[in-house]
Amino acid sequence: MLRPDESVTTSVPMNISKRVDAAVIVVVPLFVTFLMIVGGTPGKLGAFALVGLAVGAYIGLRHPTYLTRALAFSLGALPFGYVPGVHAPLVFTLGFGVVLASVIHRTGVSRVTYGEMAVIALIVTSALSVVATGSATVDYAEFGKWLVSTLVAVSLLRLPRTELELFGRIYVYAASLAAAFAVVVLMGDPAGKLIGYLSPFGYGTEEESTRFVYSGGAATVRLAGTYIDPNAAGIGLFVALMLCVLLLRDRMRLALSALLFGALVLTLSRAALFSVVFGVVLMLLFQSMRTRDRVVIIGGFFAAFVAALSVPTVRSRVFSSFGSGDAGSSARGDALADFPGHMAGHWLFGLGWGRTEFKDPGSAFEVNYVANAPLLSVYRGGILAGLAFSAVIVVGAIIGYRCLRSKHWEHGFIGGGFIGFCVVALQLDFPVVTIPATTMAFSVLIVFLVVAWEKATDNVPDDRTRRPFASQSPVATNMA
């Protein structure tokens, strides 16, 4: 009961979180309105940036798992998109938020795996190289984008496995959406005009976004879609295919894996296609499985490969790899021959991170640097970074082999796929090293290789007693 001199309201001190929320609610709208009225175009852009920063900060502090889910969708569907209204790469912005959230908030998993140790060693050696060779802002900017894309692997492995598997499924669905869109563009809009509808995300700004492969004097359009570069598309779709088989089941897995494999074939990326083939061969050689499952898998992939080769452009692309007239093979041979000369005097820390040939196709053609991920890591960051990158490959291959010995073929598929990717794609192409979005896709592949290993060895971490990225809830105040 209230005494006669008491009020029906009681003042409760506002905690810091609520004070910050109140300040944002009051200050941000006033400042945004001021910029919109008096700032002109720069002011409007600044206003949009401020709103985005405020919203992103709020989500990161109060609902950080939304960041991981948004990152999964963006990396799968819009890997080269930009934040609307702000010229900032979408996956880099979200990736930075995910990394920061994993530092600020309590994580779901505390243990560190061997795969993460190898990634951390790569980060340390790469940091040494940029400190030794960095001479301009672009060097540190490129290193920063690579760093965020690589740290995502460590941050995602801090998540509870249920949340991490949700991340993987979102990535698969988003990549499948991007694959379907790319197929529509390839079949019905070879000029690539449909991609202009994604202009709010920075797509469609190039005068000519279509990519070709030339064979026998004829030009064939390659599938790229929102991945822009067909080789980057091949890698992104390869990762999605691995996750699709690992995480999905039944008809959904069958339908989306067929879509992803078909789109991967249409990229005409030999590195990605041969990685799948190599991985399946390893799975069939080392995986213990029932005869029925083995027959179904052999029949399914044989039918898929025959269907792919029935397309003349695909058949020509595949078999030209083994001929002496393949221009790509000749260029790779010349680049390997020139590699020691490029590295003379730069073996320890490399030639630098912000070099023109990494960003300008014309300069890349003139320099003709090695299209080999481990050697390109040496070219950019020196022998220490190259050895650390090779250590990531070796540790991943060991984990992959353990997955191959699992009783479940889904684990063997991603284990063999990772080994195949390292043996084929990383030796024939370089986007994993030079393109941040593709670097992040490789980080995701490493993450789910670890997840498959945990399941294959019954070593899944117990995260039920820990809340990931959990912000503290306000303490209830008892009022007498």
Task: Report each predicted region and the residues it spans.
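Alpha-helical transmembrane segments of multi-pass inner-membrane proteins
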Residues: 127-128, 168-268, 274-285
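Interfacial loop-to-transmembrane-helix boundary motif in multi-pass membrane proteins
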Residues: 67-68, 111-122, 155-201, 408
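Long extracytoplasmic/lumenal interhelical loops at the membrane interface
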Residues: 314-381, 396, 400-406
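Helix-loop-helix junctions and helix-breaking kinks within/between transmembrane helices
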Residues: 38-44, 82-90, 135-145, 228-234, ...
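Hydrophobic transmembrane alpha-helices and their immediate junctions
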Residues: 252-253, 281, 285, 293-294, ...
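N-terminal hydrophobic segments of proteins, predominantly signal-anchor/transmembrane helices
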Residues: 58-151, 409, 419-424
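A membrane-periplasm/extracellular boundary helix in multi-pass inner-membrane enzymes
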Residues: 180-190, 287-324, 340-345, 478-479
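Transmembrane alpha-helices of multi-pass inner-membrane enzymes
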Residues: 414-424, 430-480
